[in-house]
């Protein structure tokens, strides 16, 4: 009896989750694609090129590690400084800026032969990819889903898990055909293809429905506040 009761609970939870997903498909898919696109600035993705970058720029393991650490620390500092922009500026405009910037960085990697520019590229990939493209959907979920943000996050973050699973295979295949430098153009093109799709999905931003007319104040980066309404 206990087993049957537990099974009924699981079924009910699955049905609730499916209903939630279908009702909020556009916004959940948009956030999932943002998490997916952040992969181009994540460590697991950039590390696919570690040996090729070290060989091309004649770097030791220590040199490359220092460059990567510097770019990561600098991007983390910039997130503290600029992370609050999402609270002050229109979400879609900021999203477009981040996507285009990350795409340009991917194309720049194709053409680059300067060590100094490489340092800037690594910083940019970490800031716009690992930083902003993970920050934006996280803030959006808090703004759009209120008390259901945990449920929304658990669904949307699957986009990142998908990228983490497929990109190593896809990029290894592409690198074997076109070389490591030109393979970065795949990222630049893919980002430009995903962007208009997300913008279309977010043509109308989700407005949480208030059942109690209560407002929660959520503090984000830079001590900015987001008004979140109970659903």
Predicted regions and their residues:
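Residue-level signature of mid-helix packing/kink "hotspots" within the transmembrane helices
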Residues: 72-80, 165
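Glycine-rich segments within core transmembrane alpha-helices of 12-TM secondary carriers
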Residues: 149-168
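Conserved MFS/SLC helix-loop-helix module at the cytosolic interface between two early adjacent transmembrane helices
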Residues: 77-110
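Single conserved hydrophobic/aromatic residue that forms the stacking wall/gate
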Residues: 1-13, 229-230
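Symmetry-related core transmembrane helices of the 12-TM Major Facilitator Superfamily/SLC fold
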Residues: 184-200
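Hydrophobic core of transmembrane alpha-helices in multi-pass small-molecule transporters
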Residues: 116-132
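Intracellular juxtamembrane helix-capping segments at the cytosolic ends
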Residues: 132-145
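Extracytoplasmic
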Residues: 27-52, 57-61
